[in-house]
């Protein structure tokens, strides 16, 4: 039995984790096994790489270093969590995946898409998400929400131009493959965003049972 791989993407403050947990609850109510996870991270080793990536440092991190660390964490995550869960038939709900790399390291840092694609193929083989939910909202709203949470991590300290590029990359990728992506307006009240997730549930269940 093969499970279903669902990723949740979006800029800072888009509510991915909150909505991931909501979607998990709705699926579990139907007796479906759900594996919750996140990137970078998801395993003890990958979480240590996450700490390196997010912690502010006096030594600037080169963009290629950042990219390679992302994929190093992803390789461990795939081996330790994602592939085993899919093999069990679980629904994997992952807060960020490779679309975030295209958005942050590609759009934000300006690294070539071909470089990211080469690493994607090397690390993931033919594994791609079955469905990607993009939680979209204006940059200023997302940054205000992130600031309200407290101390900013290394990415959250980037400037507005960086996050505008991140947002546009997400939207461009969603437009290029509408069969895989669903864009949700994360600027709406939470109850309305979650009503949108409820409307997606039949599609999710059909994919899982198909």
From Swiss-Prot:
Record-level Gene Ontology MF annotations: ATP binding; dTMP kinase activity
> Which reactions fall under this protein's catalytic activity?
dTMP + ATP = dTDP + ADP
Recorded hits in InterPro entries, A to Z, give: P-loop_NTPase, Thymidylate_kin-like_dom, Thymidylate_kinase
One GO cellular-component annotation of the UniProt record comes to:
cytosol
Among CDD domains, the record links this protein to: TMPK (cd01672)
A Pfam cross-reference name: Thymidylate_kin
GO biological processes: dTDP biosynthetic process; dTTP biosynthetic process; dUDP biosynthetic process
> Can you tell me which family this protein belongs to?
Belongs to the thymidylate kinase family.
Protein name, UniProt field: Thymidylate kinase
What organism does the record attribute this protein to?
Pseudomonas aeruginosa (strain ATCC 15692 / DSM 22644 / CIP 104116 / JCM 14847 / LMG 12228 / 1C / PRS 101 / PAO1)
Q: Which gene encodes it?
A: tmk
